C-alpha cells in the first residue's frame, strides 16, 4: 500500500509538461464604454465620437471672415440705418453675426413685414451686389428726395434717413402721381425694399404729400399689393407719433417690379443682387472675432473636429457635427480590459483568456503564451489581430461616415404673433433632437456589444484552431491552456502557432506518455478502493460497538426490557 501511494506522489511531483495557452491583450487603459447589457465596461482601446470643446472665438469660415453687425441687427443693416453706415461696404461673408443686445434696427418706428422670413432668406446669402435700383437724382424729378429726414434716424447729431431708401415728399407745393419700374437684368434674385408712411394727423399728411387720401401700389409677377395710409394719433416712439411700415420682395431674373403712388411712398434707392452659398447662416453671439480659421462655427465658439457628434450648441454654421444631448458617445475598438493575475498553477501555466488578458503581450490583440524546457514567452497571432483591426476600423469609419452628415443648423425666427407656431416648432425640434440622440446612443451601444462579442469569438476561434491541431497529443487544463503529452520545443511551438503542427510526428510519444499517466491513474484507483473498504469496515465496527454499549446501559437501569418468547 505504501509503495502504491509513493508511486502516485512521485508521478505528480515529477510532472513538468510543456504547455501552450491562448489569450488576449490587456493594458493599463481606463477607457470605459457602455453596451446594451452593461455600463462602464473597461476596454483596452476606444474612440470618442462626441465633441464637447470649442475655442470660445469667432473665426473665419474656410478663410472667409464673417459679417459682424455689431450694434446693428439685420433690419438696421439691410435698410441702411445711419448708425450702421460702416456696414454698407460689406459685399461678402461666410456667416452673419448679431449680438443679443443689438439696438440699431428700424430707427423710424413701425412694423417690418415678414421680417423673420427675410432673415431666413438672408441666412443663405454669402454675398450680394448693392446697386442703385432707382437713382436718386434722375428717378424722381418731380418729387423732393432730400427733405425726407427725421430726428429718429439722426447721424452725427443731425437728422438723417435710411441709406437704402428715399422718403419722397412734395416739391414746389405739388406731389404728382408717380409711376416707375425696374427690370431685373442681374441674372440672379434681387432684394427690393420699400416703405409706406402713416402720419399721425391730417396736417402732416397734407404738408408732406399735398393730399389727404393717398395710395401706394407695388406689382410684380409674384407680388401685388395696394397700400392705403392709416392716419391716426399714436404713442410716440423715438419721438415720433407717426409710423413707417417696411416691405420687401425677391425679384426673379427677367421680372419687372412697378411702383405707383400719389403719396406716402418710401421709395427704394438701393437694392441687392443676391448670391447664395452653402453653409452660410445667421448666429447670435457675444463672442469676439479672432485671427483663426474653422470649418464649424457655433455661437459659443469654433469647433475644429472631425467627430460626427457634438453637444456644444444646436445652432451651427459650416461643416459641423450633429448636435445631440448625450454626454458620452465612446465606441470600443479594443477588447475588454481585464488584466489577469500572473500566477502560476500546478504546472506553471499562465492564466489564459478565461481569467483575463495579458499585459505582457503588446504586439497584438490575440496570441499565445508557451512554456517548455527552452523557456517561455508571448507571441501575438498577427493574422487574426490584423483581420480584427481591419474589420473594426472599417466599421468605425462606416459609422462616422453615415452619422457625420455635416451641415448648417440655424435657428428659426418667429414674430410675436406666431408664438403658438414657435412653441410648436420648438416641440418638433426637441422631438427630432431626442430621436437623433436616441439613435446615436443606441447605435453606439449595439456596435459596442457586437465588437466585444466579435473579440470573444476571435479568441474562441483561435483556441479551437489549436485544439483541432493537437487533438489527443495534448489535454485541456483550463484557463485556455493545453498540456502536451510530448516534448514540444520552440520549433514545435511555432508550428502550433502558424498552423503547421505535425500531429503524426508526435502521436507515438504522446500515446506512450498518455498510457503511463493512465496506468498511474489505475494504480491510484486500486489504492483508493482498498482505503474505501477498510474505512467502511472500521466504521461499521465502531457503530456496532456503540449500539451494544448503549443497549447494555439501558437494560441495566431498567429503561430497556428484553423479552424472548418461544
From Swiss-Prot:
Record: glycosylation sites: 27-28, 40, 104, 144, 179, 286, 304, 498
Gene Ontology, cellular component aspect: host cell plasma membrane; membrane; viral envelope; virion membrane
Disulfide bonds: 21-481, 59-292, 72-84, 107-153, 296-320, 488-492
Cytoplasmic side: 551-566
InterPro entries associated with the record: Capsid_hemagglutn, Hemagglutn_HA1_a/b_dom_sf, Hemagglutn_influenz_A, Hemagglutn_influenz_A/B
Pfam families with a match to the protein in the record: Hemagglutinin
Location within or outside the cell: Virion membrane; Host apical cell membrane
Keyword Disulfide bond on entry: yes
Signal peptide start-end: 1-17
Positions of transmembrane segments: 530-550
SUPFAM superfamilies: Influenza hemagglutinin (stalk) (SSF58064), Viral protein domain (SSF49818)
Superkingdom in the source lineage: Viruses
GO molecular function annotations of the record: host cell surface receptor binding
One biological process term in Gene Ontology: viral budding from plasma membrane
Site features described as Cleavage, chain residue numbers: 344-345
Keyword DNA repair (UniProt): no
Membrane topology listed for this record: Single-pass type I membrane protein
Major localization listed first in the record, in broad terms: virion
Lipidation (S-palmitoyl cysteine): 555, 562, 565
Keywords of the record: Clathrin- and caveolin-independent endocytosis of virus by host, Clathrin-mediated endocytosis of virus by host, Disulfide bond, Fusion of virus membrane with host endosomal membrane, Fusion of virus membrane with host membrane, Glycoprotein, Hemagglutinin, Host cell membrane, Host membrane, Host-virus interaction, Lipoprotein, Membrane, Palmitate, Signal, Transmembrane, Transmembrane helix, Viral attachment to host cell, Viral envelope protein, Viral penetration into host cytoplasm, Virion, Virus endocytosis by host, Virus entry into host cell
Role this protein plays: Binds to sialic acid-containing receptors on the cell surface, bringing about the attachment of the virus particle to the cell. This attachment induces virion internalization either through clathrin-dependent endocytosis or through clathrin- and caveolin-independent pathway. Plays a major role in the determination of host range restriction and virulence. Class I viral fusion protein. Responsible for penetration of the virus into the cell cytoplasm by mediating the fusion of the membrane of the endocytosed virus particle with the endosomal membrane.
Family the UniProt entry places it in: Belongs to the influenza viruses hemagglutinin family.
Other facts: Major glycoprotein, comprises over 80% of the envelope proteins present in virus particle. The extent of infection into host organism is determined by HA. Influenza viruses bud from the apical surface of polarized epithelial cells (e.g. bronchial epithelial cells) into lumen of lungs and are therefore usually pneumotropic. The reason is that HA is cleaved by tryptase clara which is restricted to lungs. However, HAs of H5 and H7 pantropic avian viruses subtypes can be cleaved by furin and subtilisin-type enzymes, allowing the virus to grow in other organs than lungs.
Protein name, as recorded: Hemagglutinin
Species annotation: Influenza A virus (strain A/USA:Huston/AA/1945 H1N1)
The organism's taxonomic lineage, starting at the top: Viruses, Riboviria, Orthornavirae, Negarnaviricota, Polyploviricotina
Gene: HA
Amino acid at each position: 500500500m505504501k509503495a502504491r501511494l509513493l508511486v502516485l506522489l512521485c508521478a505528480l511531483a515529477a510532472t513538468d509538461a510543456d504547455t501552450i495557452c491562448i489569450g488576449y491583450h490587456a493594458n493599463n487603459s481606463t477607457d470605459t464604454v457602455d453596451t446594451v447589457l452593461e455600463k462602464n465596461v473597461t476596454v483596452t482601446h476606444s474612440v470618442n465620437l462626441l465633441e464637447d470643446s470649442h475655442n470660445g472665438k469667432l473665426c473665419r469660415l474656410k478663410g472667409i471672415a464673417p459679417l459682424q453687425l455689431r450694434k446693428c441687427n439685420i433690419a438696421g443693416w439691410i435698410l441702411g440705418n445711419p448708425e450702421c453706415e460702416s456696414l454698407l461696404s460689406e459685399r461678402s461673408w461666410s456667416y452673419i453675426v448679431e449680438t443679443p443686445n443689438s439696438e440699431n434696427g428700424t430707427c423710424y418706428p413701425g412694423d417690418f413685414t415678414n421680417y423673420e422670413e427675410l432673415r431666413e432668406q438672408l441666412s443663405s446669402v454669402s454675398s450680394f451686389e448693392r446697386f442703385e435700383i432707382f437713382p436718386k437724382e434722375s428717378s424722381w424729378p418731380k418729387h423732393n428726395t432730400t427733405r425726407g429726414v427725421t430726428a429718429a434716424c439722426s447721424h452725427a447729431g443731425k437728422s438723417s434717413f435710411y441709406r437704402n431708401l428715399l422718403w419722397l415728399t412734395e416739391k414746389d407745393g405739388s406731389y404728382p402721381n408717380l409711376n416707375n419700374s425696374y427690370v431685373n437684368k442681374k441674372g440672379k434674385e434681387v432684394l427690393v425694399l420699400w416703405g409706406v408712411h402713416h402720419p399721425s394727423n391730417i396736417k402732416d399728411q397734407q404738408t408732406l404729400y399735398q393730399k389727404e387720401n393717398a395710395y401706394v401700389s407695388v406689382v410684380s409677377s409674384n407680388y401685388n399689393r395696394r397700400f392705403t395710409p392709416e392716419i391716426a394719433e399714436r404713442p410716440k416712439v423715438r419721438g415720433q407719433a407717426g409710423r413707417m411700415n417696411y416691405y420687401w420682395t425677391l425679384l426673379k431674373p427677367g421680372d419687372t417690379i412697378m411702383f405707383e403712388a400719389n403719396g406716402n411712398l418710401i421709395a427704394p434707392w438701393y437694392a441687392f443682387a443676391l448670391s447664395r452659398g452653402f453653409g452660410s447662416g445667421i448666429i447670435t453671439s457675444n463672442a469676439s472675432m479672432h485671427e483663426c480659421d474653422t470649418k464649424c462655427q457655433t455661437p459659443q465658439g469654433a469647433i475644429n473636429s472631425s467627430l460626427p457628434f457634438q453637444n456644444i450648441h444646436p445652432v451651427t454654421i459650416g461643416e459641423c457635427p450633429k448636435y445631440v444631448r448625450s454626454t458620452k458617445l465612446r465606441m470600443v475598438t479594443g477588447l475588454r480590459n481585464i488584466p489577469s493575475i500572473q500566477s502560476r498553477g500546478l504546472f506553471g501555466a499562465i492564466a489564459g483568456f478565461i481569467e483575463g488578458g495579458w499585459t505582457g503581450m503588446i504586439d497584438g490583440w490575440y496570441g499565445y503564451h508557451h512554456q517548455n524546457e527552452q523557456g517561455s514567452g508571448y507571441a501575438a497571432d498577427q493574422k487574426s489581430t490584423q483581420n480584427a483591426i481591419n474589420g473594426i476600423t472599417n466599421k468605425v469609419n462606416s459609422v462616422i461616415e453615415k452619422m457625420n452628415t455635416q451641415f448648417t443648423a440655424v435657428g428659426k425666427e418667429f414674430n410675436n404673433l406666431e408664438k403658438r407656431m414657435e412653441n410648436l416648432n420648438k416641440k418638433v425640434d426637441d422631438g427630432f433632437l431626442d430621436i437623433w440622440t436616441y439613435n446615436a446612443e443606441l447605435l453606439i451601444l449595439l456596435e459596442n456589444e457586437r465588437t466585444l462579442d466579435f473579440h470573444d469569438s476571435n479568441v474562441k476561434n483561435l483556441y479551437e484552431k489549436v485544439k483541432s491541431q493537437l487533438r489527443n497529443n495534448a489535454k485541456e487544463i483550463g484557463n485556455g491552456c493545453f498540456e502536451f503529452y510530448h516534448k514540444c520545443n520552440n520549433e514545435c511551438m511555432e508550428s502550433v502557432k502558424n498552423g503547421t503542427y505535425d500531429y503524426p510526428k508526435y502521436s507515438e510519444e504522446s500515446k506512450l506518455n498518455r498510457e503511463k499517466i493512465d496506468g498511474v491513474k489505475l494504480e491510484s484507483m486500486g489504492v483508493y478502493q482498498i482505503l474505501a473498504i477498510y474505512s467502511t469496515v472500521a466504521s461499521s465496527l465502531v457503530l456496532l460497538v456503540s449500539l451494544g454499549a448503549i443497549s447494555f446501559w439501558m437494560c441495566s437501569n431498567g429503561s430497556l426490557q428484553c423479552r424472548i418468547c418461544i
